[in-house]
Amino acid sequence: MATSELSCEVSEENCERREAFWAEWKDLTLSTRPEEGCSLHEEDTQRHETYHQQGQCQVLVQRSPWLMMRMGILGRGLQEYQLPYQRVLPLPIFTPAKMGATKEEREDTPIQLQELLALETALGGQCVDRQEVAEITKQLPPVVPVSKPGALRRSLSRSMSQEAQRG
C-alpha cells in the first residue's frame, strides 16, 4: 500500500503586540488500497496455473485545523465531516509572572488549581496532618481488661477445673 502525505505549516508574528502564532498539520493523505468487491481469481488445474488480480483505488483524506475532514475515493467526490470540538487542557495555562521571585513576591495560585491540587493530594493517600501510630497511642488511656459486675474470679487454674469436672 503506497501512501503520500502533504503537511502544512503556518506562522505569523506581530512584533508590536509581541504575539506569535504557529501551527502545523498533516493536510492531505493519498493512499492506494485494494478495492472491495473488485478482484479476479482463476485456476487451471490441468495446466497448474493460477491468476489473481485485485482492483485498487486511491483514497484521499484532507484535514484542516478548523476541525473539517474530507475523505473519499479519488475521482468519485469527497464526503465532508465536521469533527467535534475538544478542549485540550481542563484549565487555562497558569505561569507565574516572575519565575525567580521569592514566595512572598509570587502571585497566589488560582482557586481552580488549588482545588485540583487538594483533590489530587486526597486521592493520592497523602495526609498533611499525618501522625505516627506511637504518637496517637500515647494520647489514648491504658487498656484495662473488662470484667462483668458480679462475676466470680477463678480460683482454680483451667487444668484443675477440667480435672474437677471429670471427677
From Swiss-Prot:
<dbReference type="GO" id="GO:0007512">
    <property type="term" value="P:adult heart development"/>
</dbReference>
<dbReference type="GO" id="GO:0035995">
    <property type="term" value="P:detection of muscle stretch"/>
</dbReference>
<comment type="subunit">
    <text>Interacts with MYOZ1, MYOZ2 and MYOZ3. Interacts with CSRP3. Interacts directly with the N-terminal Ig-like domains of 2 titin (TTN) molecules. Interacts with ANKRD2; the interaction is direct.</text>
</comment>
<dbReference type="GO" id="GO:0051373">
    <property type="term" value="F:FATZ binding"/>
</dbReference>
<dbReference type="GO" id="GO:0031432">
    <property type="term" value="F:titin binding"/>
</dbReference>
<feature type="region of interest" description="Disordered">
    <location>
        <begin position="144"/>
        <end position="167"/>
    </location>
</feature>
<dbReference type="GO" id="GO:0003009">
    <property type="term" value="P:skeletal muscle contraction"/>
</dbReference>
<dbReference type="GO" id="GO:0060048">
    <property type="term" value="P:cardiac muscle contraction"/>
</dbReference>
<feature type="modified residue" description="Phosphoserine">
    <location>
        <position position="39"/>
    </location>
</feature>
<dbReference type="GO" id="GO:0045214">
    <property type="term" value="P:sarcomere organization"/>
</dbReference>
<dbReference type="GO" id="GO:0030049">
    <property type="term" value="P:muscle filament sliding"/>
</dbReference>
<dbReference type="GO" id="GO:0001756">
    <property type="term" value="P:somitogenesis"/>
</dbReference>
<comment type="function">
    <text>Muscle assembly regulating factor. Mediates the antiparallel assembly of titin (TTN) molecules at the sarcomeric Z-disk.</text>
</comment>
<keyword id="KW-0947">Limb-girdle muscular dystrophy</keyword>
<dbReference type="GO" id="GO:0030018">
    <property type="term" value="C:Z disc"/>
</dbReference>
<dbReference type="GO" id="GO:0060090">
    <property type="term" value="F:molecular adaptor activity"/>
</dbReference>
<dbReference type="GO" id="GO:0065003">
    <property type="term" value="P:protein-containing complex assembly"/>
</dbReference>
<dbReference type="GO" id="GO:0005829">
    <property type="term" value="C:cytosol"/>
</dbReference>
<dbReference type="GO" id="GO:0035994">
    <property type="term" value="P:response to muscle stretch"/>
</dbReference>
<dbReference type="GO" id="GO:0048769">
    <property type="term" value="P:sarcomerogenesis"/>
</dbReference>
<dbReference type="GO" id="GO:0036122">
    <property type="term" value="F:BMP binding"/>
</dbReference>
<dbReference type="GO" id="GO:0008307">
    <property type="term" value="F:structural constituent of muscle"/>
</dbReference>
<keyword id="KW-0597">Phosphoprotein</keyword>
<dbReference type="InterPro" id="IPR015667">
    <property type="entry name" value="Telethonin"/>
</dbReference>
<dbReference type="GO" id="GO:0050982">
    <property type="term" value="P:detection of mechanical stimulus"/>
</dbReference>
<dbReference type="GO" id="GO:0055003">
    <property type="term" value="P:cardiac myofibril assembly"/>
</dbReference>
<dbReference type="GO" id="GO:0030240">
    <property type="term" value="P:skeletal muscle thin filament assembly"/>
</dbReference>
<protein>
    <recommendedName>
        <fullName>Telethonin</fullName>
    </recommendedName>
</protein>
<dbReference type="GO" id="GO:0070080">
    <property type="term" value="F:titin Z domain binding"/>
</dbReference>
<dbReference type="InterPro" id="IPR023111">
    <property type="entry name" value="Titin-like_dom_sf"/>
</dbReference>
<dbReference type="GO" id="GO:0014898">
    <property type="term" value="P:cardiac muscle hypertrophy in response to stress"/>
</dbReference>
<feature type="compositionally biased region" description="Polar residues">
    <location>
        <begin position="157"/>
        <end position="167"/>
    </location>
</feature>
<dbReference type="GO" id="GO:0003300">
    <property type="term" value="P:cardiac muscle hypertrophy"/>
</dbReference>
<dbReference type="GO" id="GO:0030241">
    <property type="term" value="P:skeletal muscle myosin thick filament assembly"/>
</dbReference>
<dbReference type="Pfam" id="PF09470">
    <property type="entry name" value="Telethonin"/>
</dbReference>
<dbReference type="GO" id="GO:0055008">
    <property type="term" value="P:cardiac muscle tissue morphogenesis"/>
</dbReference>
<dbReference type="GO" id="GO:0030674">
    <property type="term" value="F:protein-macromolecule adaptor activity"/>
</dbReference>
<keyword id="KW-0225">Disease variant</keyword>
<keyword id="KW-0122">Cardiomyopathy</keyword>
<dbReference type="GO" id="GO:0055013">
    <property type="term" value="P:cardiac muscle cell development"/>
</dbReference>
<dbReference type="GO" id="GO:0044325">
    <property type="term" value="F:transmembrane transporter binding"/>
</dbReference>
<dbReference type="GO" id="GO:0031674">
    <property type="term" value="C:I band"/>
</dbReference>
